[in-house]
Amino acid sequence: MRKTAAVLGFGFVLILTASACRKPAEAAKAEDLISGIGLTRLEVYGQRPAPDGLQSGSPHVHAVTDEGYYVMSGSGRVELHDLKQGFRTIEMTPGRYLQFPPGVLHRLVNEDHLTILVVMGNAGLAEKGDARIYFGQAVDENQAEFARLVGLAKAEGLEGALKRRDEAVRAYQSLLALWTSDRDAYNRELRRFIDVHMKAASERRADFLQAVETGPVAWGNRFKQRLAALPLSPDDLSPAIHLPPDEPTLGMCGLLRPVIKMDPADRDR
């Protein structure tokens, strides 16, 4: 088995471009992905089943960022939970695209080598605390244990990432059981978890705002500048290219090959 590089934090999409290091007033640069999005190739974990017998990623939620899945190959499904509609599943086959807003707890299930192109708004927020894995109430109330579980991928590599997934799925099985047996209790637990994450995310508002201003907001300003400059040529940006890494990183849902570094496309490659 090839070695994989563990990622810091949650990092479902793990896009951190140069935008995160710029002052908010600066415009987006050529090496940033269009409109400040995050983009990654995801191979959903399939090394061994989770405690419920399914090959899957870790159930988790985002605080302020929308997410989209475009199926490149294979098949599987997405399990969704939100406060309006509760639990439902969406089948995922090649060519299908699913998009959902923040506040939706979700888990990817791999049925046959599911490979997805993941698109996220607000590149870089995943590392800053926008995502939270569901480990249940007991872990949410124990910060040391939560930090230990989150850090398993960094500490133990692929096996650690799978252990983290397993702990999440054990708690998640209880949530699914509530959907069947006690819908009111299910709604209370889902709301509790989302509220815990939203409160934690609110403490990082300044970091989130900087990432938004140096990513999508900066790109929006650039588009306005191009419109105002017409009929002059838009700006001095040049084509840029990303070359995929040799080894994947370990995300919440699987093996990731994120678009992180963009280089000038000024020669044949």
Segments from the language model and where they lie:
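His/acidic/aromatic-lined binding-pocket segments of jelly-roll/cupin-type domains
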Residues: P59-V61, D66-V71, T89-I90, L98, ...
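Conserved short histidine dyad/triad with adjacent acidic residue
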Residues: R41-A63
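Short, conserved beta-strand element in jelly-roll/cupin
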Residues: A63-V78, D82, V119-G121
